[in-house]
Amino acid sequence: MPTGGSTAEQAEPFFVTGFQRSGTTLLRMMLDSHPEVAIPLDTTGLWARAERRLGEFEPLEEEANRRRLVESLLTEERIRLWQVPLSVDEVISASSRPGYPGVIEGFHLAYARSKGKSRWGDKDPGNMVRLPSVLGWFPDARIVHIVRDGRDACLSLLKQPFGGDDLLRCAEQWREQVGWVRQIGKILGDGRYHELRYEDLVEDPEAALRPLARFLDLEWSPQMLEYHRRVEESVPEEKRHIWPLLDRPPQASARYRWKREMSNGERICFEKRAGRVLAEFGYETLPGGASGAYLTEAMLAAGRVRAAVAGRLPGR
């Protein structure tokens, strides 16, 4: 693999993933600010959904069928949110990969070229549970996994309209998904899997990003630290409310909010379900695991309290 200056045709694609509200968008913005890299807004399961419809367009070896598939995908909302007017010809001609992976790569390469860049990546938290599909499409892909303390990730997620209201279920999902991705990473090995923590990224961005750049065979670029100056061109206005802090440098104060916002009961209940995995990722947990004094409080508080704080339970 060449280092720095590598073209999209020479370099493997990479996929950024992580549990929801764990800094995937922040990391996407930083990488997208590199002069060689283009990562559009989340595809949010688009490629998996389209794969289930491939029977309507087969065989893809026939260009007419590939064109029909691309035409269909160009009408998707997730592609519109990329804010780049792509044509069927641009997508078809961008990639020489055969079959459906070539269509996916064609979209990403066409997007990258529209930005004057050579390297493409995809960012989607949902890829945590779809990694077998991703690796089936792109056996040479590299995986970038950003991990955030599950207590903070869940607190943030439950404040979102799409986040649900069950803290305990969120704890279980965080435990299962980050553990699952790490296990896949062990199979892939260090050459194809890179893991970093959100807390380290916001505390010292350059120290966290330099190893990631090396992993992706990219030369270091200080432009990655200037991501907050590019929000208007990189995030559609209709979506900016989801990430209100993107237009400023990393906020170290965003770390460990659970210490201020979680009750003892919520913390114990969360750690009952995910404490072992929290500890495996180097996060602080109660000595000896959650037990005893606050258990009743925990069971009463879990799930409902976070929804009440977010103002979504009428009359509370």
Q: What is the role of each PLM region?
A:
Residues 108-249:
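PAPS-dependent sulfotransferase catalytic domain
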Residues 18-19:
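P-loop (Walker A) phosphate-binding loop of NTP-binding proteins
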Residues 24-25, 150:
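Conformational gate/switch positions in structured elements
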